[in-house]
Amino acid sequence: MTKELCMRCYISGRVQGVWFRASAKNLAEQLMISGWARNLADGRVEVFACGKEDKLEEFYTWLQKGPLNARVDVCTRENLPWEDYITFDVL
C-alpha cells in the first residue's frame, strides 16, 4: 500500500499571472491530491498538498516545470505528516 503524506512547496520564477495555481489545481484533482495553492507577496507560489506518495511525486515533478507560460527557477519541498484535506483550493 502506498504511504499517504503531505508536502509544502515554494515555487519561484515567473509563476504568478501564468495560470500556475489553476493548473496545479487541475492536476491535483486528476491525481486525487488535496490541499491548496496561493500567491505570496514576494512573487512566489506556495503549495500545500496531501495524497499518496507516488501521486505527490508526480505532482512535485510537475511543480518543478509548471504550466506552459511559467518559468520555474526554484522549487523547494518539505515533507510533512498526513493531514486529511478533502479538496484542492486556489487561495
From Swiss-Prot:
The active site is at 21, 39. The keyword Hydrolase applies. Residues 6-91 form the Acylphosphatase-like domain. It comes from the Bacteria. This is Acylphosphatase. One of its GO terms (molecular function) is acylphosphatase activity. The keyword Hydrolase applies. Keywords: Hydrolase. Belongs to the acylphosphatase family. It is an enzyme of class 3 (hydrolase). It catalyses: an acyl phosphate + H2O = a carboxylate + phosphate + H(+). Its EC number is 3.6.1.7. It comes from Legionella pneumophila (strain Lens). InterPro entries: Acylphosphatase, Acylphosphatase-like_dom, Acylphosphatase-like_dom_sf, Acylphosphatase_CS.
